[in-house]
Amino acid sequence: MKIKFEENLKYQLEAIKSITDIFRGQEINRNVFTIESTHENQIFGKVENYFGIENGLLLHKEDILDNLNKIQTKNGLEKTKDINKSNYNFSVEMETGTGKTYVYLRTIMELNKNYGFTKFIIVVPSIAIKEGVYKTLEITKDHFKLLYDNLPYDYFIYDSKKIDTIRNFAVSDNLQIMIINIDSFNKDSNVINQERDQANGYRPIEYIKQCNPIIIVDEPQNMESENAKKAISQLNPLCTLRYSATHRDKYNQVFKLDSIDAYENQLVKQIEVSTIELINNTNTDYIKLQSIKLTKTGINATVEL
């Protein structure tokens, strides 16, 4: 059984465009970098070089800020006053159940189509989310190939036992999507941060840094510690795209679809909570009739509350 995906949901297209328009004016620019083997890997004095492909950004920060402010104005969000390369974080708020994962995966495809960006890393806080993202990539494969004219792309879950996938990520000129758990690269003891023979004597993270990848952070509120922020910044991102329904910090927010918006647009169902009524409950208001007296002016009753 194949799942059919709706490709023209207005709010999803708006969320995608709110990211892609940040780079309006960017020309396709693929930069090449050289990876040189270390001395230990040289054979008979011959140096074996590899050529990697990195994301290249031509826009200045003033261009990014101008594009960002136009998006924020259009979407009724607070305008960012200043921005710099170290602060290229952009937040998308989407209510649970509205297709957040689909949106950021399709955003990847659009960024590749429009600007030629090829290196993307999806950072997740847990194994469950990691497996969920990979599954979504599997079931959307035919859908995206149809939408994007059989665009060739590779996706994989980072595995510390398969370091060669990092080198392939760096040298491939096809669209590359890596999924990685934050715990796999936020400590010095992680394999990715250590020199390895499989990586020609380099630390595998050095390959990633040279790629200048676009980072997508899924559920960033779970990765707001200083250690997590430092780890993500060491990937040398071109920019960081943050997707959640419950952001702790909304860095340069570009799109908002909260629970109220989702309900008003009939994207999620309303939950009704019924009141609880106890049967045979003796814990009710107490009243006791003490006496009744007939008088000339009427009837008097004495009660105990």
Language model segments and positions:
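RecA-like P-loop NTPase motor core of helicase/translocase proteins
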Residues: 1-305
